[in-house]
Amino acid sequence: MASSTKKDYYEILGVPRNASQEEIKKAYRRLVRKYHPDICKKPECEEKFKEINEAYQVLSDPEKRKLYDMYGHAAFEGAGAQQRVETTEIPPIEEILREFFDFDIGSIFERATGRRRARRRRSVKGEDIVVPVEITLEEAFKGTTVPIEVEREVPCSACGGTGYDESKSRTCPTCGGRGETVQGNWFFQVRQTCPTCGGEGVIYENCHACTGRGYGLVKETIKVKIPPGVRDGSKLVVEGKGHAGRYGGPPGDLYIIVKVKPHKIFERKGDDLYVDVNITYPEAVLGTEVEVPTLDGEKVKVKIPPGTKEGELIKVPGKGMPRLKGSGRGDLYVRVHIDVPKIGVLSKLLGDGKKVEELLKQLQEVLPKPERIVER
């Protein structure tokens, strides 16, 4: 779905934009009870709940919520990342109960039988990791590789991320492997999903290594390539380097938010660079040539034409930043500033203040009068 047609996440959950995390969780719990497919059997409930779950996954995560508040749905689409940050997999109702109420629906079975129950869970995509990275303008010009240290969840090596031990399974004693129970008599019968195995027909024991979580935590250094021409605020993605998916689901992605430090000489606007140079008043009148630096290390000579005005821009083609999308480079603009000396400085240099003042008055008489008010 295009970002222009997607509903506002706050509107989906029915909360204001300044809602607290507790208000967001409360709204989500209310919608779970109304629309979760395990509760609501209407065909439209599944798509509705996917929308609700996606909104909650973003607004309940402070980093993702910050990006969403700044850029809207575009924060997780298009430039840089090229991936959508969303969770359309529907977590089982017991997983939600565990998250909000610290309640395991299987605990009743465990207390009654004295052994852990571990049904097959529905796979869920792993959470994304968002990391800010600061680089210099020179690094943005040339491109660079930066090491990113992250602590991420990885699939359990013992169970492969499923959370259960397939070698230790048995037919459900309640339903006999059918996945449903039948109550009533020959005249009237009610069929319902087996409460012991959740409709699977088989009971699996939790993995001993991860105790059913399906993942473990590891610290990892990931080298991320920053392309030449990257802009401040650009989003880059390393696919599959987020947190592990739940119960065999695909992993999330690692998102890099690039911050380019301000430069002491150059100002950047898009793919163009701006540099300020000072010239004297006679140079402005007569014209001159100045040498200016560039980010590729060379210096270029720029001609200042006679009659140059304060703040005038002189374009040096092809000496700006590399274009991130496309070939070539932007332009370098030299912004001219005229250093007008005070009369006291001229008097010291020439040794006669009155003579300097007379010369300036004579010059003022012959020069054309400028328009005082500048029209934009």
From Swiss-Prot:
CXXCXGXG motif repeats lie at residues 156-163, 172-179, 194-201, 207-214. InterPro entries: DnaJ, DnaJ_C, DnaJ_domain, DnaJ_domain_CS, HSP40/DnaJ_pept-bd, HSP_DnaJ_Cys-rich_dom, HSP_DnaJ_Cys-rich_dom_sf, J_dom_sf. Keywords: Chaperone, Cytoplasm, DNA replication, Metal-binding, Repeat, Stress response, Zinc, Zinc-finger. GO terms for biological process: chaperone cofactor-dependent protein refolding; DNA replication; protein refolding; response to heat. Its cofactor is Zn(2+). One of its GO terms (molecular function) is unfolded protein binding. GO terms for cellular component: cytoplasm. Binds 2 Zn(2+) ions per monomer. The keyword Cytoplasm applies. Participates actively in the response to hyperosmotic and heat shock by preventing the aggregation of stress-denatured proteins and by disaggregating proteins, also in an autonomous, DnaK-independent fashion. Unfolded proteins bind initially to DnaJ; upon interaction with the DnaJ-bound protein, DnaK hydrolyzes its bound ATP, resulting in the formation of a stable complex. GrpE releases ADP from DnaK; ATP binding to DnaK triggers the release of the substrate protein, thus completing the reaction cycle. This is Chaperone protein DnaJ 2. The lineage of its organism: Bacteria, Pseudomonadati, Aquificota, Aquificia, Aquificales. The gene is dnaJ2.
